[in-house]
Amino acid sequence: MNKRYLQKATQGKLLIIIFIVTLWGKAVSSANHHKAHHVRTGTCEVVALHRCCNKNKIEERSQTVKCSCFPGQVAGTTRAAPSCVDASIVEQKWWCHMQPCLEGEECKVLPDRKGWSCSSGNKVKTTRVTH
């Protein structure tokens, strides 16, 4: 009977240890998940980059961005970097008003108004907006 009591007590302790370790693991995982995806209000961060070349040897790049903008702002681009911009710029597709190009580059809205191009000399970078 004493041996059986020890086995039951050991099993109980083992279950409690497993339970505590499981809870601790979930708490740590949750804390890391929250830290990794928190973006300070008014800022944006790139969470994924994609880069490839098409058959015409034109380099294509895309990125996934997470932004936390203030009310009245949405995700946009300023000086070739993700940023929060006034929502009316995006709603009305006045892309060049958010100053998306680097200093010295000329901004032009694409004819279909679905993006913009930045040019300097014979180099042209085209950005198409997708949702």
From Swiss-Prot:
Disruption phenotype: Mutant mice grow and develop normally but exhibit impairments in spatial learning and memory and impairments in short- and long-term memory, accompanied with increased level of anxiety-like behaviors in open-field test. They also show decreased level of depression-like behaviors in forced-swim test and tail-suspension test. They show neuronal loss, defects in dendritic and synaptic morphology, and apoptosis in the brain. GO terms for biological process: memory; visual learning. Transmembrane segments: none annotated. Keywords: Cytoplasm, Nucleus, Signal. It is found in: Cytoplasm; Nucleus. GO terms for cellular component: cytoplasm; nucleus. Pfam families: TAFA. The keyword Signal applies. InterPro entries: Chemokine-like_TAFA, TAFA_chemokine-like. Residues 1-30 form the signal peptide. Mainly expressed in different brain regions, including cortex, amygdala and hippocampus (at protein level). Expressed by neurons and astrocytes. Has a role as neurotrophic factor involved in neuronal survival and neurobiological functions. Belongs to the TAFA family. This is Chemokine-like protein TAFA-2.
